[in-house]
Amino acid sequence: MACLAPIVALAAPQRANIESVESLVIESTNEFRASHNLSRLTRNPQLDLAARNFAAHLATGAAFSHESGGTTPEIRVFRAGYQACVVAENLERQYSSAGFATHELARTLVQAWKDSPGHRKNMLEPDALETGIAVVHRAHDGIEDFYAVQLLARKESQTVYFMIRNGSELAATYRVNGKQFTLNPNYGRKHGRCSTPDLLFEGRARGRFEPKNDECFIVEKDGSVTRREPGGCG
């Protein structure tokens, strides 16, 4: 008489909703940035495209690195139509035979980046204004495999330009993001910064400012500094 073994039903692996995972990653990243008094990131479709193309490449089993396939984050966002002056990229891979619930996968990805000093620094990049995210799923050998690419960037067109004019009779000394400059009397100089500008006047003219685009700073005859609204230099 044949002996029949009991049939054990194997639970199907959980399947995370990819679109929801991506949205949750952005939401969690913005909450993390807000807790450090940093601006929220706006999702950009070109950055999404660059992230998705690279995540799909990694999911083929290619080398898991930022230069996989002989490209760099800067090259990839450029090919997607994004002219960047700041680019940071985070990669992560999570896999399990049991799969992941939607919130679980999003939470796991974000926590992995927070726990890594380099990735954490990227998440808190102060000069980034936009983001792209892609999570690509690959099922193989009984494994639910997820590849995530996060991009944080700032467009070249978002560069801040500002002018400094020296209307005094003495040379004016100042620093822009730590770099020192000297401006002779009756001269002007235009600066452009992709990163958030930090303007520090030293010597007779003193004051610290965070210039906005197209603002003008004038060193007056008495050494004081006048800040003028965009277009204020004429």
What are these regions (language model features)?
Residues 194-206:
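A short, solvent-exposed beta-strand micro-motif common in secreted/extracellular proteins
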Residues 151-161:
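Short domain-boundary/entry signatures in modular proteins, especially
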Residues 206-234:
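Extracellular beta-sheet/turn segments enriched in Thr/Pro/Gly and aliphatic residues
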Residues 1-7:
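Bacterial N-terminal signal peptides
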Residues 160-171:
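Asparagine-centered strand-capping/turn motif at beta-strand->loop junctions
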Residues 73-153:
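A well-ordered secondary-structure block
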Residues 178-196:
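Intrinsically disordered, low-complexity Pro/Gly/Ser/Thr-rich segments with frequent PxxP/GP/PP motifs
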Residues 12-77, 125-132, 136:
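Short, well-ordered surface patches within globular domains
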